[in-house]
Each structure stands twice: as structure tokens, then as C-alpha cells.
Design a protein with these regions (language model features):
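Extended, charged catalytic domains and RNA/DNA-binding interfaces, predominantly
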Residues: 1-220, 225, 239, 243-246, ...
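C-terminal functional module detector
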Residues: 233, 240, 244, 249, ...
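A short, acidic, flexible beta-alpha connecting loop/helix-capping segment that sits on the rim
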Residues: 46-47, 262, 297-302
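Short acidic/histidine-rich active-site segments
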Residues: 222, 248-272
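Soluble non-cytosolic domains of exported or imported proteins
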Residues: 24, 232, 236, 269-273
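Mid-to-C-terminal alpha-helical segments outside catalytic/metal-binding sites
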Residues: 270-308
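Short, well-ordered secondary-structure micro-motifs
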Residues: 178, 198-200, 230-231, 266-268
Length: 308
């Protein structure tokens, strides 16, 4: 299993008495990653620009916490910076930990800070969150706006460095533009299908197809508000979105991006160790074993191998 998005580091820094990365009260920890046979977990460093007076300082604090926890539990998990690192984790039966930034605005439009983030081991950036920033417009804003000149420069530099560009939270116009700018795949790390659930945060059909045509992946988001009308995150709704995305973008586009520890905890899938229930549900819905393996890890693994 590869999960392309969680907010566990945010919970650990905000609730230090609720456990650490090895064992905690949230949805993801090392114990449960091992129990769930996880190959790789992306850990997002999320910063709310409107809540933080020093957004870059908040990012640095979260990164330092991530580093210290990975070092403390290095017998079980490793911070990966390249696909070679991922391969070593697989061979040694360790969980691979990918580090990402959720909210490109924390870098303030500064290419030097982007280079430093890369040097510090960040390999994926979600360009926007819910506010306009130096890079572009979020899905909550004008859907037709494009990336800024700074945003274009950032994306081009990310491609040069070998970083994954993430369009989850980005508006439609900016996402369309990524298809023209990039020569490599890009992803929507935690997004669903707008035609299934009419939320602007979800992807319209033409962007599902675009991401698929570029060789990218779309990670299924478990947030109940993006899945349907139920008050809980239901397995049936996740399957419905997954099958729809496969139908529109192909079986090579689908992946997992749970958003665990960043969404409400009312989920039928109890935590990251409970993902076998979703696997069984997709098999029961008609996916072959190979198609389900693609969804659970092979598609994301292919993309990581191509970019990192």
C-alpha cells in the first residue's frame, strides 16, 4: 500500500500528549503502518497561512519534528529522497516516508526556499490550499485563473529538481496549465470526482483525463464531505469514486490519498491498518487483482520511480 497524503505530523505537533509517530491516538502511526503492510506513506507538512504569523517557521518546526521522529524510529521507517531509497526500504521491510508540503505559499514565492526544501528532503508540494498565494489560485477561488509567473517558475524548478507537483486544492485553470508546462506526470494527491460529488475540491472529468494522459495519479480522498451526502466516510462511496475515476482516466491513474488525520475521524475504515476492507470492496466491485494492486500501490510506485 502507498498512501499519498496524511496530516499526522500536524496532529503530533498540535497534540504532543496524544502519542508520537510510533504510536498515537490518530489514524496513522508506525505500528499501524506495519500492521497494514504499508510500503510508503507521504507525510504532509500542512500550514494554514491565515492562522500562522510565521508560516515558514511553522513549516520548519514541523519538518524538524518529522526528522526527529524518523531518526528515533529508524529501525522501522526511513525518510526517502530518491527511488533508490524507496527500493532499499522495500528490501529491508521498512516503511518508506515521503515528505511533502501542503500549501506552497509557505515558501513565499522564493526559489531559494524551494531549493532548501529540496535539500531538506521535501519531494512533493501541494501548490495551494484554500487561499490564493504567490503561485496560483485555489479551487475556492476563480476557476479560470492561471498560475502566476512565480508559480510557473516554481513548477519548472520542481521539474528540474525531481519534485512531484500536486494539484489537489488548485483551481481548474491552474491545473489545466500544468499539462502544458510539465514534461513529466503530475498528481492530485487527495482528490475525488466532481461528477460523483459536486464539490469544487473534486476533479472534473477533463482534468481526470488530463492527469491520466500525463501519466499522473489521483489519490482517493476519504473525507466524507468530498465523497457524498453521508455524515461518515463510507467504503461504498470511496469505491464509487474510484470506479468512476478509472472509467474516465484509465486504470493507471487511480491511487490512494486518504487524508487521514486531516479529516474528520468518522470513517468506516478505522485507520491505516484497516485498509484491507477497502481492498476487498474494490475486488467485490469487479476490479481484478492486478487493477486493485495498481490502485493500492503500483500506480503510485511507477510515478515515484519516474520522477524521483
Amino acid at each position: 500500500m502507498i498512501d499519498l497524503h496524511c496530516d499526522t505530523i500536524m496532529q503530533l505537533i498540535d497534540h504532543p500528549h496524544d502519542g508520537d509517530l510510533f504510536s498515537n491516538n490518530w489514524k496513522i502511526d508506525i505500528e499501524r503502518l506495519i500492521k497494514g503492510h504499508s510500503r510508503l506513506q507521504d507525510f504532509a507538512l500542512f500550514v494554514d497561512l491565515e492562522e500562522q504569523d510565521d508560516s515558514y517557521g511553522r513549516y520548519e518546526s514541523m519538518r524538524q519534528l518529522f526528522d526527529s521522529q524518523i531518526q528515533k524510529y529508524s529501525d522501522y521507517i526511513s525518510h526517502v529522497r530518491s527511488y533508490d531509497d524507496i527500493t532499499v526500504c522495500y528490501e529491508n521491510h521498512k516503511v518508506a516516508a515521503l515528505l511533502s508540503i501542503e500549501e506552497g505559499g509557505v515558501l513565499g514565492g522564493d526559489l531559494a526556499k524551494l531549493d532548501k526544501a529540496y535539500a531538506d528532503g521535501v519531494r512533493l508540494i501541494t501548490l495551494t490550499w484554500n487561499y490564493p498565494n504567490e503561485l496560483g489560485e485555489p479551487n475556492t477561488g476563480d476557476s479560470h485563473k492561471k498560475l502566476t509567473e512565480t508559480g510557473i517558475a516554481f513548477v519548472e524548478r520542481m521539474q528540474e529538481l525531481g519534485m512531484i507537483v500536486d494539484c489537489s486544492h488548485l483551481n481548474d485553470g491552474g491545473t489545466e496549465q500544468l499539462g502544458d508546462i510539465l514534461d513529466v506526470p503530475f498528481i492530485a494527491s487527495h482528490s475525488n470526482a466532481r461528477e460523483v460529488t459536486a464539490r469544487r475540491r473534486n476533479l472534473p472529468d477533463h482534468l481526470i483525463r488530463l492527469i491520466g494522459e500525463k501519466g499522473g495519479v489521483i489519490g482517493l480522498n476519504f473525507a466524507q464531505s468530498f465523497l457524498g451526502t453521508s455524515s461518515i466516510s463510507r467504503i461504498d462511496d470511496i469505491v464509487k469514486h474510484g470506479l468512476y475515476i478509472i472509467n474516465k482516466g484509465g486504470e493507471d491513474v487511480i491511487a490512494l490519498g486518504t487524508d487521514f488525520d486531516g479529516i474528520k475521524p468518522n470513517t468506516e475504515i478505522e485507520d491505516i491498518s484497516d485498509m484491507h476492507r477497502l481492498y476487498d470492496a474494490f475486488r467485490g466491485a469487479g476490479l481484478s487483482e492486478e487493477q486493485t494492486e495498481k490502485l493500492f500501490w503500483k500506480n503510485a510506485d511507477r510515478l515515484l520511480k519516474e520522477i524521483l
